[in-house]
Amino acid sequence: MSAVYVVRPKADHDLDEQTYYFATKAGPELGHRFLLAAHEAFRLLATQPEMGWHPRLKNPLLASLRVFRVSGFDKMLVLYQPSPDGVEILRVIHGSRNIMALVHREGVE
């Protein structure tokens, strides 16, 4: 059985927003490159879910949350959690955002 990744609705929305941002600021090619790099990161995480690091969050319900950088877009972070078949992609955010505040304010699901 091959490893899979599932992109949750908030992560899908994040991807749309970031792709649009890169495309409007630097051209459609950059938006497309970002989208390809993000999905490549998702595929890699699905096969090696322990690659990311644990953010320091006080909420015990988020103990399985992990973070990984998108290659070529090092300020873009993938928030995910391992699942029995691979990973669930919860959010895709800019690294300048406060992960703890974001998770508490907007959630990850």
Q: PLM features: residue spans?
A:
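Hydrophobic pocket/interface hotspot
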Residues: A11, A38, L45, I89
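Hydrophobic alpha-helical segments of small multi-pass membrane proteins
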Residues: L36-E40, R66-F68
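Generic structural signal for secondary-structure transition and capping sites
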Residues: Y20, G27, R43, T47-M51, ...
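Short, hydrophobic secondary-structure boundary micro-motifs
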Residues: G31, W53-L57, A101
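Residue-level signal for well-ordered alpha-helical positions
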Residues: Q18, Q48, L102-R105
